[in-house]
Amino acid sequence: MSAQKSAGIQLLLDAEREATKIVQKAREYRTKRVREARDEAKKEIEAYKAQKEAEFKKFEAEHTQGNQAAQEEANAEAEARIREIKEAGNKNREQVIKDLLHAVFTPSPEAMAAH
């Protein structure tokens, strides 16, 4: 009976070893699949990111041109307005200076109001 028990125990030990090998292979396979899935996800994320960056650059380029044209137009209008103001200032400059000097240096006999 001892030989039968020994053979039965040996059979159980062999089955346990075989089961351990199967479980270990399953774990290794699962770990490998997780790594592959992670790598695949990274690649998809990078591709999606590159696509969105390209779309953003295209959008930015299209809208920057419009903004640039508006900026140039605004600059031209500002320059024209500055020229007008300078011309108006130069036109009446002498008279304004005379009026200011006259007002500052000519005393007027008016009483000051008390506060």
UniProtKB/Swiss-Prot annotation:
Gene Ontology MF term list: ATP hydrolysis activity; proton-transporting ATPase activity, rotational mechanism
Record keywords, A-Z: Hydrogen ion transport, Ion transport, Membrane, Transport, Vacuole
Membrane topology label: Peripheral membrane protein
Localisation: Vacuole membrane
Pfam families from the UniProt entry: V-ATPase_G
Stored Gene3D superfamilies: 1.20.5.2950
A single cellular component GO annotation: vacuolar proton-transporting V-type ATPase, V1 domain
Coiled coil: none
Subunit structure comment from the entry: V-ATPase is a heteromultimeric enzyme composed of a peripheral catalytic V1 complex (components A to H) attached to an integral membrane V0 proton pore complex (components: a, c, c', c'', d, e, f and VOA1).
General function of this protein: Subunit of the V1 complex of vacuolar(H+)-ATPase (V-ATPase), a multisubunit enzyme composed of a peripheral complex (V1) that hydrolyzes ATP and a membrane integral complex (V0) that translocates protons. V-ATPase is responsible for acidifying and maintaining the pH of intracellular compartments.
PANTHER family xref list: V-TYPE PROTON ATPASE SUBUNIT G, VACUOLAR ATP SYNTHASE SUBUNIT G
Family from the record: Belongs to the V-ATPase G subunit family.
Name listed for the protein in its UniProt record: V-type proton ATPase subunit G
